[in-house]
């Protein structure tokens, strides 16, 4: 079973292929436009860091290790302080299929040069764990908070040339939730360093991409259970996205999750986003959080129900005003019907 996809319980190889393909296109398109990275110590903006890493995840001794992965966005605010948002997959262990999102503060403890950094980080980890349960489905979607501690080392082999924005990463992550399993993860990955559009001296470039965007999307829903591959459906969505201030955006949309046999759900999503853009709006990466007001035809309780939604997105603009967008939504419910929605979308910016 392939364990490295863009989110967790969807068919994993296909998720990895799509996200890797889009990242490769972004890297190739952005190479000529990148300037040398700056430093907050000189007054120049520090580059943002985006990385994808695979991890070997260890838990109880009687369980063999499994493969996990993560996606991270890090922003440097001062020479010795940075903050990151990340999605972490904590692999599959007996009775536990866990992943989650985290926000960490980072302190570089060996800032030897711009080419090599060693940092220690920590912050809250909100996890989603599919666990065994004595109910009709045989499982429950358990949610909870924990602390995450991390150690991270990066090296940037090239300081000039077409690959100067790439870096390689090694990291260790540790978390021990009070109501879930303890895990220690050892990972390696590849990343991209680039200056966000908001720091460009050209006022028009600093705006990033257009203030408004309409996106029509289509792909699939996967209901989170121990037999997720049997509970999938086609999904479609339409969204309106609006820039609020610099890298902050807001979206409202309609989502139809289809019929997975466990859910038959559709409704309205509203989310706030942190979405920096790069290379004059050529591409962007973002994380969102909000609410999903939906009707589930298979839920006994009548009427609309409000769930949380956590999202990631990556967009690429191949031609003027049009963009291709990859979206992942995690629907977080209180009735054991969490779901992953993966969407490919075509957007129009104006």
Show the residue positions of the predicted features.
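Outer-membrane beta-barrel pore domains and translocons
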Residues: 53-57, 86-90, 121-127, 171-175, ...
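Cleavable N-terminal export/targeting peptides
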Residues: 1-48, 80, 113-114, 160-164, ...
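Gram-negative (and chloroplast) outer-membrane scaffold detector with strong preference
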Residues: 77-135, 237-307, 316
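Outer-membrane beta-barrel architecture
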Residues: 70-72, 104-108, 150-154, 187-191, ...
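Residues that define the transmembrane beta-barrel architecture of outer-membrane proteins
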Residues: 63-69, 97-103, 143-149, 180-186, ...
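Extracellular loop and loop/strand-boundary signature of outer-membrane beta-barrel proteins
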Residues: 57-59, 89-92, 134-140, 173-178, ...
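Outer-membrane beta-barrel "beta-signal"
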Residues: 182-204, 214-220, 338-350
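Repeated loop/turn-to-beta-strand initiation elements of outer-membrane beta-barrel proteins
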Residues: 48-50, 79-85, 111-118, 158-168, ...
């Amino acid at each position: 079973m392939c364990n490295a996809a863009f989110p967790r319980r969807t068919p994993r190889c296909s998720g990895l292929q799509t996200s890797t393909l889009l990242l490769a296109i972004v890297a190739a398109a952005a190479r000529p436009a990148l300037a040398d990275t700056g430093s907050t110590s000189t007054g120049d903006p520090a580059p943002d860091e985006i990385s994808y890493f695979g991890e070997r995840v260890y838990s109880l001794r009687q369980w063999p290790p499994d493969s996990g992965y993560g996606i991270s966005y890090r922003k440097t605010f001062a020479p010795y302080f940075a903050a990151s948002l990340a999605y972490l997959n904590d692999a599959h262990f007996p009775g536990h299929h866990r992943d989650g999102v985290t926000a960490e503060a980072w302190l570089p403890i060996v800032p030897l040069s711009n080419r090599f950094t060693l940092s220690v980080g920590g912050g809250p980890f909100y996890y989603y764990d599919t666990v065994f349960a004595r109910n009709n489905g045989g499982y429950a979607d358990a949610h909870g908070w924990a602390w995450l501690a991390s150690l991270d080392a990066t090296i940037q082999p090239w300081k000039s040339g077409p690959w100067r924005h790439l870096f390689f990463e090694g990291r260790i992550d540790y978390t021990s939730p009070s109501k879930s399993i303890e895990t220690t993860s050892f990972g390696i990955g590849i990343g991209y360093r680039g200056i966000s559009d908001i720091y460009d001296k050209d006022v028009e470039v600093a705006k990033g991409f257009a203030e408004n965007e309409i996106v029509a999307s289509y792909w699939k829903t996967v209901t989170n259970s121990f037999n997720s591959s049997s509970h999938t459906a086609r999904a479609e969505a339409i969204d309106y996205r609006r820039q609020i201030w610099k890298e902050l955006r807001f979206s409202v949309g309609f989502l139809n999750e289809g019929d997975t046999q466990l859910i038959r759900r559709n409704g309205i999503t509203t989310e706030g986003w942190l979405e920096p853009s790069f290379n004059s709006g050529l591409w962007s990466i973002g994380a969102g959080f909000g609410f999903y007001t939906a009707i589930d035809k298979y839920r006994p309780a009548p009427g609309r129900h409000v769930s949380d939604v956590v999202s990631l997105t990556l967009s690429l603009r191949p031609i003027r005003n049009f963009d291709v967008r990859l979206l992942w939504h995690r629907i977080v419910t209180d009735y054991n019907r969490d779901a992953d929605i993966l969407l490919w979308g075509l957007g129009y910016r104006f």
